[in-house]
Amino acid sequence: MSTVHEILCKLSLEGDHSTPPSAYGSVKAYTNFDAERDALNIETAIKTKGVDEVTIVNILTNRSNEQRQDIAFAYQRRTKKELASALKSALSGHLETVILGLLKTPAQYDASELKASMKGLGTDEDSLIEIICSRTNQELQEINRVYKEMYKTDLEKDIVSDTSGDFRKLMVALAKGRRAEDGSVIDYELIDQDARDLYDAGVKRKGTDVPKWISIMTERSVCHLQKVFERYKSYSPYDMLESIKKEVKGDLENAFLNLVQCIQNKPLYFADRLYDSMKGKGTRDKVLIRIMVSRSEVDMLKIRSEFKKKYGKSLYYYIQQDTKGDYQKALLYLCGGDD
């Protein structure tokens, strides 16, 4: 008989693999899609005195990514100009950031966010960690390919020159996208062994055997690790997250915490990040925008449900309270509705 955990695990896998991406996305392909008509309407909106932002937002947030690529192609055919550069000149501020993000393919978007996180002085570790820890094998492999295409250098090379120590080792191992895929066979012996190894390498000893932690957490499948973290509690007086806080510090601690949260429940991980981006004074718009853009066709409906469950009010409500104008409108369309 399957345990509840196995059933849940199977469900979460189906959410990740066998359902088409749009099943839990808030943005779906537009039914009466006409790229030529959309391109013409956007051209008119850009030429309008003062720019008709509402039309631009309405069209681009209500089309799938694939459809947006078709619109950009049709626009270039019509005007001999690139849609992205035309919109860059026409828009500004956070709205411009959202709209330009929507025009990139998912891999181009992630690649450009990763590049930005490592450009110039200092690294935006937070963005680097979020993207590298939360993407699937397939997504990471595509990001690596596109990154090289866009920047004529390897993602791994940039990570190596921008990070150091065990944090670098963890990021490089994750960025390869070589984690085992979830199989149908559950290896209870290995689950037990991994749980014990994580404990022996950390809480049980003085100092931490970080390479051991890295190899288990970057090589095993998501479903396997969910069970390992459960089993871990029967060896350790602390759960995995508490153990990380006790054992490591700085960027490495932050990266392990993000990774374990992603493995345990990815939609909840993003719900927490969204909440943190809007709580208190001021908004961390970069994080808010990146999650709304990158998850809108993947799992936004799951994120919304986790958000409401944990914070008592809907994601929609929080965005309404925290943003304004056409920027707000764009985010609310990507959110896809109130709960």
Curated annotation (Swiss-Prot):
Gene3D superfamilies with a match to the protein in the record: Annexin
Crosslink site: Glycyl lysine isopeptide (Lys-Gly) (interchain with G-Cter in SUMO2): K49
SMART domains given in the database record: ANX
N6-acetyllysine carried by residues: K49, K152, K227
List of residues that carry Phosphotyrosine: Y24, Y199
Chain positions of cross-link Glycyl lysine isopeptide (Lys-Gly) (interchain with G-Cter in SUMO1): K49
GO biological process, one term: calcium ion transmembrane transport
Coiled-coil stretches noted in the UniProt entry, renumbered to this chain: none
Chief localization: secreted
UniProt keyword terms in alphabetical order: Acetylation, Annexin, Basement membrane, Calcium, Calcium/phospholipid-binding, Extracellular matrix, Isopeptide bond, Phosphoprotein, Repeat, Secreted, Ubl conjugation
Annexin repeats mapped onto the chain: 33-104, 105-176, 189-261, 265-336
Pfam families: Annexin
Reported modifications of this chain: ISGylated.
GO molecular function annotation: calcium channel activity; calcium ion binding; calcium-dependent phospholipid binding; cytoskeletal protein binding; phosphatidylserine binding; phospholipase inhibitor activity
Family as reported in the entry's similarity comment: Belongs to the annexin family.
Function: Calcium-regulated membrane-binding protein whose affinity for calcium is greatly enhanced by anionic phospholipids. It binds two calcium ions with high affinity. May be involved in heat-stress response. Inhibits PCSK9-enhanced LDLR degradation, probably reduces PCSK9 protein levels via a translational mechanism but also competes with LDLR for binding with PCSK9. Binds to endosomes damaged by phagocytosis of particulate wear debris and participates in endosomal membrane stabilization, thereby limiting NLRP3 inflammasome activation.
Subunit structure: Heterotetramer containing 2 light chains of S100A10/p11 and 2 heavy chains of ANXA2/p36. Interacts with ATP1B1. Interacts with DYSF. Interacts with COCH. Interacts (via repeat Annexin 1) with PCSK9 (via the C-terminal domain); the interaction inhibits the degradation of LDLR. Interacts with CEACAM1 (via the cytoplasmic domain); this interaction is regulated by phosphorylation of CEACAM1. Interacts with APPL2 and APPL1; targets APPL2 to endosomes and acting in parallel to RAB5A. Interacts with S100A4. May interact with UBAP2.
Domain-related comment: A pair of annexin repeats may form one binding site for calcium and phospholipid.
The protein, known as: Annexin A2
Organism: Bos taurus
